[in-house]
C-alpha cells in the first residue's frame, strides 16, 4: 500500500521534486527494484481476457511473463536491474496484512458469485482483488532471474528499505517501487512506473527526497511523522485526517507527539486517535529498519551472461512460452547487458543547482495551474447544477 496520498502532497507542495521522463533517460544506470511489488503488478496487469496467463498444466505464468519481458525492456534501454525480495514482514505490519488477507477472502467470495451472476467487468474487478504473491511466485521469479543473468538479493524484512540502503551507498542510482514509503526509508531517489509495460505509455517518475524535504520545508523526522499521519502499512490513519490536514498539523506542531497532545486536548474532539495507535513503533521502523549494510557479503551482486538453453527449457518446455521469442529475448539480453556497461556523461559533470528565484518561479507557476484547475472544476460543477435545476422544455 505505501503512504496514502503522499504523491499528491508532493505534487502540490514540492513540484520541483518530481521529474517525469522516458525510460531511455536512465541508460547506463544501475537500479534496485522492489521485486515483490513488481511481481504483484505483473499478476494484476499481465492478463488475457481478464484472466491470469496459464500454462497447459494450469499453472499461473503472468508473473514470469511480466518479469521476463519487463526486465528485457529495461535492459534494452541500457538499465542494469537488481531485484530485491521481501523477507519476513515486521511484527507491526501483521495487523495490516491480516486486513489485506480478509479483504482478499471477501473478494474471492465476490469473484465466485460474479462468475455465476455478474458481468465480465465485475468478474475481472473481483479477480484482480484476489491476487497475492506466493512463495512459489517468488521462487520461480528468482529461478528465472538467475537464468537471465540478472542479480537479486533477499532483504531481511522490507525490500524498499534495503533498496534505499543500496541507493544511499551509491551501489545503485535509485530505488524503484510503486510504494511511496521507499522515501520514508531515505532512498535519495525513487523511480516509479519503471516496470510498467510500454503499452501503458506512462512516463518514468523520478522523485528526489532532498527536494521533497526542501519543498515541504521539513526535516526527515517531520516528513516521516507526516507520512504516518497520512496512513502507512504499519498503522491505520486517524479518521477524518486527510492529506491537507496531515501536512497542516505537522507544520503547526512540528512532531507527532505534539499533534497527538493537541488532538487529545481539543475540547471539540474534532479528531479521535484510534485506541491502539503505536506511532512511536512505526516511526522506529522507518528510522531504523532491519537491513543489511551495503558492504555486507549478501549485498554483493553482478550481472552475467544468460543461460540460453536453460532459459528455453524453463520457459518453453516447462511453462509453454514461445521458443522464438524466448531465444530472441535471451540474445538481446546477452548483447545489451554488455552495452549497459558504458559510462554516462553525467559522471563527469556536476549538475547545476536551481537558484532560489528559479525554485520560487516553478512553485508559483504550479500554484497558478492548480488554482486554474480548481476554478474550472468549480465552474463546471456550477454549470451542471444550473442545468439540472433548469425546467424541462425551457428555452
UniProtKB/Swiss-Prot annotation:
GO terms for cellular component: mitochondrion; nucleolus; nucleoplasm. Gene3D superfamilies: 5' to 3' exonuclease, C-terminal subdomain, 5'-nuclease. Its cofactor is Mg(2+). Residues 122-253 are annotated as: I-domain. Its main location: nucleus. Mg(2+) 1 binds at residues 34, 86, 158, 160. Binds 2 magnesium ions per subunit. They probably participate in the reaction catalyzed by the enzyme. May bind an additional third magnesium ion after substrate binding. It is found in: Nucleus, Nucleolus; Nucleus, Nucleoplasm; Mitochondrion. One of its GO terms (biological process) is base-excision repair. Residues 356-395 are annotated as: Disordered. SMART domains: HhH2, XPGI, XPGN. Residues 356-389 have a biased composition (Basic and acidic residues). Mg(2+) 2 binds at residues 179, 181, 233. It holds the Pfam family XPG_I. PROSITE patterns: XPG_1, XPG_2. Its EC number is 3.1.-.-. Residues 1-104 are annotated as: N-domain. Residues 341-349 are annotated as: Interaction with PCNA. Structure-specific nuclease with 5'-flap endonuclease and 5'-3' exonuclease activities involved in DNA replication and repair. During DNA replication, cleaves the 5'-overhanging flap structure that is generated by displacement synthesis when DNA polymerase encounters the 5'-end of a downstream Okazaki fragment. It enters the flap from the 5'-end and then tracks to cleave the flap base, leaving a nick for ligation. Also involved in the long patch base excision repair (LP-BER) pathway, by cleaving within the apurinic/apyrimidinic (AP) site-terminated flap. Belongs to the XPG/RAD2 endonuclease family. FEN1 subfamily. This is Flap endonuclease 1.
Amino acid at each position: 500500500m505505501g503512504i496514502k496520498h503522499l504523491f499528491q502532497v508532493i505534487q502540490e507542495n514540492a513540484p520541483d521534486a518530481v521529474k517525469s521522463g522516458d525510460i531511455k533517460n536512465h541508460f547506463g544506470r544501475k537500479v534496485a527494484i522492489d521485486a515483490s511489488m513488481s511481481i504483484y503488478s505483473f499478476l494484476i496487469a499481465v492478463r488475457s481476457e481478464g484472466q491470469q496467463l496459464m500454462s497447459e498444466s494450469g499453472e499461473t505464468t503472468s508473473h514470469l511473463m511480466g518479469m521476463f519481458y519487463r526486465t528485457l525492456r529495461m535492459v534494452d534501454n541500457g538499465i542494469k536491474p537488481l531485484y530485491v525480495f521481501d523477507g519476513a514482514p515486521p511484527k507491526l505490519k501483521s495487523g495490516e496484512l491480516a486486513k489485506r488477507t480478509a479483504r482478499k477472502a471477501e473478494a474471492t467470495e465476490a469473484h465466485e458469485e460474479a462468475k455465476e451472476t455478474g458481468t465480465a467487468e465485475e468478474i475481472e474487478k473481483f479477480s484482480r482483488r484476489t491476487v497475492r504473491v506466493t512463495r512459489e511466485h517468488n521462487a520461480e521469479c528468482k529461478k528465472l532471474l538467475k537464468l537471465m543473468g540478472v542479480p537479486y538479493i533477499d532483504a531481511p524484512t522490507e525490500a524498499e528499505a534495503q533498496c534505499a540502503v543500496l541507493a544511499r551507498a551509491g551501489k545503485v542510482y535509485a530505488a524503484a517501487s510503486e510504494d511511496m514509503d521507499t522515501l520514508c526509508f531515505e532512498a535519495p531517489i525513487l523511480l516509479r512506473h519503471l516496470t510498467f509495460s510500454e503499452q501503458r505509455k506512462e512516463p518514468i517518475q523520478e522523485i528526489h527526497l532532498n527536494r521533497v524535504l526542501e519543498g515541504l520545508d521539513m526535516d526527515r523526522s517531520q516528513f516521516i511523522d507526516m507520512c504516518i499521519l497520512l496512513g502507512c502499512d504499519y498503522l491505520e490513519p486517524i479518521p477524518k485526517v486527510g492529506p491537507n490536514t496531515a501536512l497542516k498539523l505537522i507544520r503547526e506542531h512540528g512532531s507527532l507527539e505534539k499533534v497527538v497532545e493537541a488532538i487529545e486536548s481539543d475540547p471539540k474532539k474534532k479528531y479521535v486517535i484510534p485506541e491502539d495507535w503505536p506511532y512511536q513503533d512505526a516511526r522506529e521502523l522507518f528510522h531504523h529498519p532491519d537491513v543489511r549494510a551495503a558492504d555486507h557479503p549478501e549485498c554483493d551482486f553482478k550481472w552475467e551472461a544468460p543461460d540460453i538453453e536453460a532459459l528455453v527449457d524453463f520457459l518453453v518446455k516447462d511453462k509453454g512460452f514461445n521458443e522464438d521469442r524466448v531465444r530472441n529475448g535471451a540474445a538481446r539480453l546477452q548483447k545489451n547487458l554488455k552495452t549497459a556497461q558504458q559510462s554516462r556523461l553525467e559522471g563527469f559533470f556536476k549538475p547545476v543547482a536551481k537558484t532560489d528565484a528559479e525554485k520560487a518561479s516553478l512553485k508559483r507557476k504550479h500554484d497558478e495551474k492548480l488554482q486554474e484547475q480548481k476554478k474550472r472544476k468549480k465552474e463546471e460543477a456550477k454549470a451542471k447544477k444550473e442545468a439540472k435545476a433548469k425546467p424541462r422544455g425551457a428555452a
